[in-house]
């Protein structure tokens, strides 16, 4: 397991609130859309995130991770803009920090970006909105920040005098991304079977916890799973003297240094003839 960077020291919440006020001052409009195929809001949001992380990678930065709670909040705030005749952070719903607290999102610093584009959601919407943010230094500095580690995008369409409104909500938060694990190989020598696996903790720009250990799960002939190793840092396991004529399976789950536990992997099995 490769060692992650040390977890950043949490910032004082009072300072974070002051910084947030500066973060949310930027907003932008976008040039009118040309004719293009209609798409879903979810596809536009995913495309913007892909563009953001492409440019972060080019600058040697780690990706921003999508947080579904931030995306839900961003969707709601975009809908507020679509329903309002005013384009502002206040019209989007006011204090983002208070909203984050209300839905239980832990944060040290938050930021919000707004954009609008004439017309409906099309295949050109993501590039147009991201292009506007990219060409605005205040917006660009937030998206390429070394502080923020989570993001959520939201979009909404005003049908009368059609416009698309886009919102990005960013936070610097503790690592709450579950680590991943997968089985790699299953081999046999006589009645001894050996399994290997790997795990990783998705990297964050800040507060990255890093992979800690695994739990190992075992079953025979599709029976009940039982955990046979807890908190092991091993990435292989040999089991000897297995009874012939049975199928033996292993699966693993990973844990990071922040205590986040990932899903149990797909199992891998081998039969002893």
PLM region descriptions:
Residues 3-38:
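Secretory targeting and sorting signals
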Residues 240-247:
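Surface-exposed, short loops/turns at beta-strand junctions within beta-sandwich domains
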Residues 227-234:
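Short beta-strand segments within Ig-like beta-sandwich modules, predominantly Fibronectin type-III
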Residues 39-103, 146-151:
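Short, well-ordered surface patches within globular domains
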Residues 257-273:
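Extracellular fibronectin type III
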Residues 200-220:
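Solvent-exposed loop/turn segments flanking beta-strands in beta-repeat/beta-sandwich domains
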Residues 95-172:
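A well-ordered secondary-structure block
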């Amino acid at each position: 397991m490769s060692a992650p960077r040390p977890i950043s020291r949490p910032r004082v919440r009072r300072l974070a609130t002051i910084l947030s006020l500066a973060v949310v001052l930027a907003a932008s409009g976008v040039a009118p859309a040309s004719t293009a195929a209609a798409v879903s809001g979810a596809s536009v949001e995913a495309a913007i995130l892909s563009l953001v992380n492409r440019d972060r990678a080019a600058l040697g930065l780690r990706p921003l991770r999508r947080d579904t709670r931030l995306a839900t909040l961003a969707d709601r705030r975009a809908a507020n803009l679509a329903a309002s005749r005013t384009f502002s952070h206040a019209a989007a719903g006011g204090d983002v920090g208070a909203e984050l607290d209300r839905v239980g999102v832990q944060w040290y610093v938050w930021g919000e970006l707004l954009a609008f584009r004439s017309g409906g959601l099309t295949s050109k919407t993501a590039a147009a909105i991201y292009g506007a943010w990219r060409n605005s230094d205040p917006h660009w500095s937030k998206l390429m920040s070394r502080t923020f580690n989570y993001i959520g995008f939201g979009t909404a369409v005003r049908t009368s005098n059609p416009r698309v409104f886009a919102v990005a909500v960013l936070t610097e938060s503790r690592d709450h991304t579950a680590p991943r694990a997968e089985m790699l190989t299953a081999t046999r020598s006589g009645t001894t079977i050996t399994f290997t696996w790997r795990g990783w903790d998705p990297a964050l720009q800040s507060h990255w916890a890093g992979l800690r250990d695994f739990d190992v799960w075992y079953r025979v002939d599709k029976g009940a799973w039982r955990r046979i190793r807890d908190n092991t840092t091993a990435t292989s396991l040999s089991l000897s003297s297995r009874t012939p004529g049975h199928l033996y399976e292993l699966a693993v789950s990973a844990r990071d240094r922040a205590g986040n536990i990932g899903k149990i992997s797909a199992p891998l099995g081998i039969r002893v003839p």
